[in-house]
């Protein structure tokens, strides 16, 4: 078959296959034309799901009489005149294919009147015929387009249409998406002569709240977080679902310069922002991104559903940072506890209270019999798994469950000085007797056989600290050996793990639960304290963070310049905003808009010591945790005083007293 040019009628019908997918596609194209014409009111009438009639009436600028026939021609548009216009598109339409494509598969009537004309004119075209007939008509300023018998000349396309209800649902859903971003427009939607939707123009905050409730639901409108962020030519505003709202909706609307798009980059940024809150479903959001039209290409999809950003990574990080700043006011769900080593042992009991699933009683920090038996059995299974698992399996099992956040009981930052701790010798009998006494008064039920078997399995765990002095002496000998031979010291076998949060350690006749998070925080603090004297490495942010600055912050930056440089921070004041350019790697994933102002207030009147600074960085720094094996190796390499401090944080379990009590009964 020779190559030839397609007839215009056939070319229009081929284009209609891309533009006109279903009645909702027709409504989209025609309503967008109305908005481009400056309309403030758009009325949509639908019959039989749009297959019989689609009528769009607006009060826009209208089309002059001598341009009506041209408007129904292919590639005829008033929105693009040059390549420069194509590279900076702000209108919805620009290809000039919609009316020609629709008229090739339906009977189309266009009636319009401009402000300068004394009368309206009507153009009619249908099917493959390209002839357009004109006649005078009665019509106010604006345009009305009627599309009758959609796909009347393409039976194959008509057979693929769904039921009238389904097709109207698609139209209704599309109208919601455009009504939420164009709040200045009055929309009405009727189906088979019945008014179904009416969105009045929203010019006040109350009216905007009402429209948001109409479209996204009352629960979302009442609990949504309002977002407004602007930086370096990018502007993001809208609403995101509150982490405290557990409802599941399909409200996922994202607009670029007013155009609704579906973009994986945006979905990734939203999910990453909500990751700290352990969001298990797609969060709901209505976000409007405004940027220079030269920085985005909208001419990449036939239906204009997708766009391409020239600086996609920059846009992604801007959206992520804006969402994280908005979510910073909400504590993360199930976030790791942040230990303060100056607090007493009650902090562990508070941790148990915040997480009842860990098997510890909120009031005493000890286990109830029925619940603790399950926890002990879990620990025994964990012990067997960790003895036989590989390193990668152990890393995968780290952080199975998490604490709830424990607020610090102290109002100011205090140095974490190890010298204030006096190592204590553990009196096993006294500790066991006292705890067993409290336990016997609080419970009366006997210990179950399952619990006794669990205790026996736990006691099969390798004894990590049978005697503190002997253990440290052996470890010191290992350090001596490594210094002499240069080989890695032998690390003791890792104990069992309870609920992914505690190590179960035997010490003489004591059974102790050592919090993993306390060890990880200590190791992180120790690492930072070794690096601080020479200064932390600075890492530039891909997108600097801007925070509204107080008047005296400029003086603080000058007075504490050397301290901030030591912390790896590069901060400047510009246009009454604090610009965060560089941060140490420990703070890169933190809420900088909250932490840096907090740091400036702290250092305003004092120069904190290195232990205090390292404690602050460790507490607020990176959230990803070390694997169990790496944490245990780090613990084994700690000095004796440091291990003693951590072991004092462990909770003693009076297993011997419980067994004696059970046997006596």
From Swiss-Prot:
Domain of life, per UniProt, equals Bacteria
- Keywords annotated in UniProt: DNA damage, DNA repair
Q: Would you tell me the Gene Ontology cellular component terms?
A: mismatch repair complex
Which residues lie within the region annotated Disordered? 348-370, 385-445
Pfam families named among the record's database cross-references? DNA_mis_repair, HATPase_c_3, MutL_C
Which CDD domains has this protein been placed in? HATPase_MutL-MLH-PMS-like, MutL_Trans_MutL
Q: Please give the coiled-coil regions recorded for this protein.
A: none
Query: Per its UniProt record, what SUPFAM superfamilies does this chain match?
Result: ATPase domain of HSP90 chaperone/DNA topoisomerase II/histidine kinase, DNA mismatch repair protein MutL, Ribosomal protein S5 domain 2-like
Q: Where is the composition biased (Low complexity)?
A: 426-445
Which GO terms label this protein's molecular function in UniProt? ATP binding; ATP hydrolysis activity; ATP-dependent DNA damage sensor activity; mismatched DNA binding
Which segments show compositional bias classed as Polar residues? Answer: 348-361, 407-421
Q: Which SMART domains match?
A: DNA_mis_repair, MutL_C
Q: Which GO terms describe its biological process?
A: mismatch repair
The function of this protein is: This protein is involved in the repair of mismatches in DNA. It is required for dam-dependent methyl-directed DNA mismatch repair. May act as a 'molecular matchmaker', a protein that promotes the formation of a stable complex between two or more DNA-binding proteins in an ATP-dependent manner without itself being part of a final effector complex.
Q: Which PANTHER family match?
A: DNA MISMATCH REPAIR PROTEIN MLH, PMS, MUTL, DNA MISMATCH REPAIR PROTEIN MLH1
Which NCBIfam families does the entry link to?
mutl, PRK00095.1-1
Family, per entry: Belongs to the DNA mismatch repair MutL/HexB family.
Q: Which named protein is this?
A: DNA mismatch repair protein MutL
Its gene? Answer: mutL
């Amino acid at each position: 078959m020779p190559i030839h040019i397609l007839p215009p009628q056939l070319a229009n019908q081929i284009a209609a296959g891309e533009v006109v997918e279903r009645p909702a596609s027709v409504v989209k194209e025609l309503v967008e034309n109305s908005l481009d014409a400056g309309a403030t009111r758009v009325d949509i009438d639908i019959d039989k799901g749009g297959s019989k009639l689609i009528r769009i009436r607006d009060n826009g600028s209208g089309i002059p009489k001598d341009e009506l026939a041209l408007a129904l021609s292919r590639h005829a548009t008033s929105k693009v005149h040059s390549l420069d216009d194509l590279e900076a598109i702000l209108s919805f339409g620009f290809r000039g294919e919609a009316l020609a494509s629709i008229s090739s598969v339906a009977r189309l009537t266009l009636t319009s009147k401009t402000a300068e004309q004394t009368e309206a004119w009507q153009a009619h075209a249908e099917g493959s015929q390209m002839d357009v007939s004109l006649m005078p008509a009665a019509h106010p300023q604006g345009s009305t387009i009627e599309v009758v018998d959609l796909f009347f000349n393409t039976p194959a396309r008509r057979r693929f249409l769904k039921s009238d209800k389904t097709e109207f649902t698609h139209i209704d859903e599309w109208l919601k998406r455009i009504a939420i971003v164009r709040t200045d427009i009055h929309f009405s939607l009727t189906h088979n002569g019945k008014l179904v939707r009416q969105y009045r123009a929203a010019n006040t905050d109350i009216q905007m709240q009402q429209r948001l409730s109409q479209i996204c639901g009352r629960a979302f409108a009442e609990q949504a977080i309002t977002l407004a962020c602007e930086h370096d030519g990018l502007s993001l505003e809208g609403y995101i679902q509150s982490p405290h709202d557990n409802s599941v909706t399909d409200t996922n609307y994202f607009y670029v310069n007013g155009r609704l798009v579906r973009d994986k980059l945006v979905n990734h940024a939203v999910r990453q922002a909500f990751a700290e809150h352990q969001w298990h479903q797609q969060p709901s959001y209505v976000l409007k991104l405004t940027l220079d039209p030269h920085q985005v290409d909208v001419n990449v999809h036939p239906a204009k559903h997708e766009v391409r950003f020239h600086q996609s990574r920059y846009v992604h990080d801007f959206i992520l940072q804006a969402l994280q700043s908005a979510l910073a006011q909400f504590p993360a769900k199930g976030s790791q506890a942040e230990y303060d080593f100056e607090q007493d042992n009650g902090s562990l009991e508070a941790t148990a209270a915040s997480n009842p699933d860990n098997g510890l009683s909120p009031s005493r920090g000890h286990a109830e019999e029925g619940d603790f038996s399950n926890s002990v059995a879990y620990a025994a299974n964990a012990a067997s798994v960790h003895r036989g698992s590989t390193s990668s399996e152990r890393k995968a099992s780290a952080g199975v469950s998490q604490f709830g956040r424990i607020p610090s009981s102290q109002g100011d930052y205090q140095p974490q000085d190890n010298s204030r701790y006096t190592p204590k010798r553990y009196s096993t009998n006294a500790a066991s007797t006292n705890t067993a006494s409290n336990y016997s008064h609080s419970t009366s039920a006997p210990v179950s056989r399952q619990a006794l078997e669990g205790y026996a399995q736990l006691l099969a765990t390798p004894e990590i600290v049978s005697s503190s002095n002997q253990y440290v002496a052996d470890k010191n000998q290992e350090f001596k050996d490594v210094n002499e031979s240069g080989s890695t010291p032998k690390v003791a076998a890792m104990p069992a793990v309870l609920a992914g949060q505690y190590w179960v350690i035997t010490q003489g006749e004591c059974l102790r639960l050592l919090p993993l998070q306390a060890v990880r925080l200590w190791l992180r603090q120790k690492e930072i304290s070794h690096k601080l004297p020479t200064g932390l490495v600075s890492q530039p942010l891909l997108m600097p963070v801007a925070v509204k600055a107080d008047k005296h912050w400029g003086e603080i930056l000058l007075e504490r310049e050397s301290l901030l440089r030591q912390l790896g921070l590069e901060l400047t004041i510009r246009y009454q905003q604090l610009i965060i350019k560089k941060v140490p790697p420990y703070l890169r994933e933190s809420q900088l808009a909250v932490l840096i102002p907090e740091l400036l207030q702290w250092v305003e009147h004092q120069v904190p010591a290195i232990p205090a600074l390292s404690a602050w960085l460790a507490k607020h720094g990176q959230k990803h945790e070390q694997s169990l094996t790496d944490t245990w190796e780090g613990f084994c390499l700690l000095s004796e005083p440091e291990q003693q401090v951590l072991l004092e944080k462990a909770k003693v379990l009076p297993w011997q007293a419980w067994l004696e009590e059970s046997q006596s009964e």
